[in-house]
Amino acid sequence: MSLRVPQEELSGLRSRNLNELAAQIDWSDSAAGFLTERATFETVLQSVINHDLWFDALSLLAHALAPRQSIWWAYSVCCQWYEVGHATKDDTATSLLDLTRTWVIEPDDETRLKLHDLALAIPNRSPAHWIGMSVFWSTGNITPDAGVVTAPPPYLYARGVSACIDLAASLAGLSRQEVYLGALAAGIDLAGGGEGRVTFQGKAQI
């Protein structure tokens, strides 16, 4: 299975500035070689996908999407991971996913803080943990109990999104390539203004 990145500008991205994005990403040495003077966001994304540099591709797309889009992408992949990976979704994970959907549609700080508490109650080897952390890191104060206001570092949420999807690929019990390609296809669809439906082995999940 191959994946083609549209070479026209993807209209749904928050940023296509490779210099800005590249400064935030821990690139592999192989991926860094594609950051040439004439490169575009789309050509670099296509190159890292063609060379199976999956985490580089996830990171680039997670950073380029707007925070709510990026988190919705991780949420959609995680929902599909539970469906096809036969993982047990306990009450805490169910609550976290339901609340994430609510937050993406209508974000507010109370929900963000609840999602942080739920994330801390889930092991960090679960993709769901990183969705909750991504929401917490996307905006607001990340030291609410310290008596000071600390804004999250720019793009910190994108690291949580990348971790979520990478873990889903590792733990799904399917071909990792199948999961990466399905997730990236959904992310590219979101970046192009689509709904970002995730499909693994012919199954779909909103």
Task: Enumerate the language-model features and the residues they cover.
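Hydrophobic, small-residue-rich transmembrane alpha-helices and their short perimembrane loops
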Residues: 131-132
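Short, glycine-biased loop/turn motifs at secondary-structure junctions and
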Residues: 1-124, 136, 140-206
